[in-house]
A protein has these predicted regions:
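Mixed-charge (Asp/Glu-Lys/Arg
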Residues: 1-80, 86-180
């Protein structure tokens, strides 16, 4: 069961909720939708839709960070080991100096994978020797994992994952949820 919640008031189709925290998936069911992440109105094939979701999640996370006051740049070059640059501060302004953080974005449902380098989607030509690797501090400073069903963002210092396995359940990372 997902822990994502949404404050809402809906006055359509006989659904009324008065500022109660309602689990997101129940909200979407009440509105006639199954969930936010499995709506594919255009009928794209599964591989293309997965790639599009990854791109969309990069922009959603960038938007959240910008709304929080961070400067963000999405890296639009394939093959890089990080997805975005985030300008943060060592200490709160005005005393703290700016620091540029390399961030790797991951989409999470029940867990976050810390493995990269694999080929997503449909590969029309099989090539052996594709190298997957676990992210390290040589690759990025942060892993930003977005929960695909409610857009909570888990802010994970890359140095943490050196002690973890190849993935971790988001239920075990609650202190990192939206911890800016």
């Amino acid at each position: 069961m997902n822990s994502c919640h949404l404050q809402f008031k809906v006055y359509a189709s006989g659904v009324i909720a008065n500022d109660k925290k309602v689990e997101l998936h129940k909200t979407f069911r009440a509105l006639g939708m199954s969930s936010i992440y499995d709506i594919n109105l255009t009928g794209l094939d599964k591989g293309k839709m997965a790639a599009n979701l990854g791109d969309a999640h990069e922009h959603i996370v960038a938007g959240i960070l910008i709304r929080l006051g961070f400067d963000v740049g999405i890296v639009d070059v394939s093959g890089t080991k990080y997805d975005m640059l985030v300008i943060a501060f060592e200490k709160p302004p005005p005393d703290g100096k700016k620091v540029i953080l390399r961030a790797q974005l991951r989409t999470a449902s029940r867990s976050v994978s810390f493995i990269g380098g694999g080929r997503g989607g449909i590969d029309r030509e099989y090539k052996s020797g594709v190298k997957t690797r676990k992210f390290t501090t040589k690759d990025s400073d942060l892993i930003l994992a977005i929960d695909r069903s409610c857009f909570d963002v888990y802010v994970i210092p890359t140095e943490f994952i050196a002690r973890w396995g190849n993935s971790k359940a988001i239920s075990k990372m609650q202190p990192l949820k939206n911890n800016w």
